[in-house]
A protein has these predicted regions:
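Catalytic machinery of carbohydrate-active enzymes
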Residues: 1-281
Length: 281
């Protein structure tokens, strides 16, 4: 990849590269000037901003599933004439267990489950008391091993304390580079995630991803790739009818601070057991 400025000199360099098409995958107005200068076919991502605005307006008539983000990206290339139809087989190949992460737990026959308990916004994070309840429930499952994912000093400290408290937990946070984290993820049986990046990374390897949704909702099109509806566990919309309050979870209206408390840990646990049983068939 190479970054080329959008000025006149940059346009000349693009011409020299011999490009035949221009694609804007950010739906940025400035990008429209590039194909004008280059006189090349141009297609832009359609994010569906108006649809998403209606979805997050609180108006019941706007509450309907929107096109997935994966499909929106594929659509751009189809409009250029390419075959782009993401399917179940479009996943990354699994990698070897990272050599630099010999935790004494990665033995054959064990159920390796990832747990990514954090997200960019508080309205998308499962409360710590319920997360600990879930961890304790999962700890009773024979041969289970939980690998904890996060980043940043505070998350590293929290996950480290959980590792000390629960012998079947191992924190990955801050211990190995991203490339090795990805290799580790590819060896898991399941990823439990918030509406956050770790779930998407796991889905890239074809893993089952169980996502817990707070003030956001999969109808906005950001559910991990190729996951069944049953793998989305939602906050109670009867109690919190304004969900989704925003697309990214950065807006938490008054009274919606504790939406994720409406997701019982036992319900998450039961779905984990179902997924693990399904993967053994």
């Amino acid at each position: 990849a190479q970054v080329i400025g959008a000025d006149t000199a940059g346009h000349r360099r693009l011409v020299d590269k011999g490009f035949t098409h221009v694609v804007d995958l950010q739906e940025q107005a400035a990008a429209a000037f590039i194909p004008v200068k280059l006189e090349k076919p141009f297609k832009s991502l359609q994010k569906g901003r108006m649809e998403k605005k209606q979805l997050t307006s609180g108006d019941p008539s706007g509450f309907k599933p929107l096109k997935s983000t994966h499909e929106r990206y594929a659509e751009v290339f189809r409009r250029l004439g390419y075959h782009a139809k993401p399917g179940p087989g479009d996943i990354l190949k699994g990698e070897a267990w990272p050599k630099n992460f010999d935790d004494g737990m990665a033995q054959s026959g064990q159920l390796r489950v990832g747990l990514a308990p954090f997200a960019a916004h508080a309205g998308k994070c499962y409360p710590e008391p319920q997360m600990k309840e879930l961890i304790q429930l999962l700890g009773a499952v024979p041969h289970i091993r939980l690998y904890l994912f996060g980043g940043g000093q505070r998350e590293i400290e929290v996950l480290g304390s959980w590792e000390e408290a629960y012998p079947y937990c191992k924190s990955v946070a801050g211990k190995i580079p991203l490339t090795e984290e990805l290799a580790l993820i590819s060896n898991l049986r399941l990823m439990i995630s918030m509406d956050s990046g770790n779930g998407h990374l796991a889905a890239m390897y074809g893993l089952p991803v169980l996502t817990l949704w707070g003030v956001t909702h999969p109808y906005a099109g950001f559910a991990p790739f190729n996951q069944p509806e049953a793998n989305s566990i939602l906050a109670n919309r009867k109690k919190y009818p304004a969900i989704p309050t925003s697309v990214y979870g950065n807006k938490v209206p008054e009274g919606y601070e504790n939406v994720m408390e409406s997701i019982p840990a036992k319900g998450v646990y039961n779905r984990v057991l179902e997924i693990l049983q399904e993967s053994q068939i």
